[in-house]
A protein has these predicted regions:
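Phosphopantetheine-dependent thiolation modules in NRPS/PKS and related acyl-activating systems
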Residues: 2-35, 39-45, 50-80
Length: 80
């Protein structure tokens, strides 16, 4: 069974078609070509499905980095 962090990482890997070694606290919106507005909505959709949550619009907008995402997803009761 995957941990929540593995599920979180897999959402990025699946949404952006990137390798896990690209992930880290410095990855953020528009820091890689794949994380544009279309990629952002894909990521949000995958995260909502994987964690069975529905994010508020403010949280979708504030989801600006890999690191910030942990905080935002945590607001919905997901523990990392």
């Amino acid at each position: 069974m995957l941990t929540n962090k593995q599920k979180y990482n897999n959402a990025f890997i699946e949404s952006f078609s990137i390798n896990e070694n690209v992930l880290g606290n410095d990855i953020s919106y528009n820091s890689i070509p794949e994380w544009d507005s279309i990629g952002h909505m894909s990521l949000i959709a995958v995260l909502e499905e994987v964690f069975d949550i529905m994010m508020e619009m403010d949280d979708i907008i504030d989801f600006s980095s890999y690191k910030k995402g942990f905080e935002i997803i945590g607001k919905y009761g997901v523990k990392f």
